């Protein structure tokens, strides 16, 4: 009986100690986080290049398309320069043809190719797939983008870039006609419009993550339309 009383007393003291350590001396003043929250993952359909490769094994070559900005190239320096030059603090520069003439003439020689794009394009070319680039950019008076992309990604059978911006189109999303015209099976892009254009065309859209320091803000919601999202695709 005495032993039982001793054990009960010890248990009470231990519980009291745990309670003391667990209690907050003062309420938090900021939202903060904890180790458990930091490791939580959203229920997103993540996919890897290796998984895609295995999935496509044994299948006939297909046509695939890529958006350019924040998908295959980190081109924010060009857009930052354009905004500072043509409309500081505003996005009016995106409607200025002089900006598009300048950026498309050769600014992308200073853009950084994303490693995820290198990996994807290498995988698709090894399969014999055709690669197309479909961008929301407005065409300039000179296309300096196509040769930059061909060199950066070692494209064997290069097709001219499709500039869809500023065109009157019969679809809701401006990349949809290009996707349909080239009989694309998979379209890769970072923006909501990329995923929605793929849906409009009735094909598979796969999201690439946008770099956190991109000038293209706000950031889109990954998996917001139920699309697959490539892991480690922000660089």
From Swiss-Prot:
Enzyme Commission designation: 3.1.3.2
NCBIfam families (alphabetical): AphA
Cofactor note: Binds 1 Mg(2+) ion per subunit.
Annotated function: Dephosphorylates several organic phosphate monoesters. Also has a phosphotransferase activity catalyzing the transfer of low-energy phosphate groups from organic phosphate monoesters to free hydroxyl groups of various organic compounds.
Names of required cofactors: Mg(2+)
Highest rank taxon of the organism: Bacteria
Record keywords, A-Z: Hydrolase, Magnesium, Metal-binding, Periplasm, Signal
Subunit structure, as described in the record: Homotetramer.
Binding annotation for Mg(2+): 67, 69, 190
Principal subcellular localization: periplasm
Protein name: Class B acid phosphatase
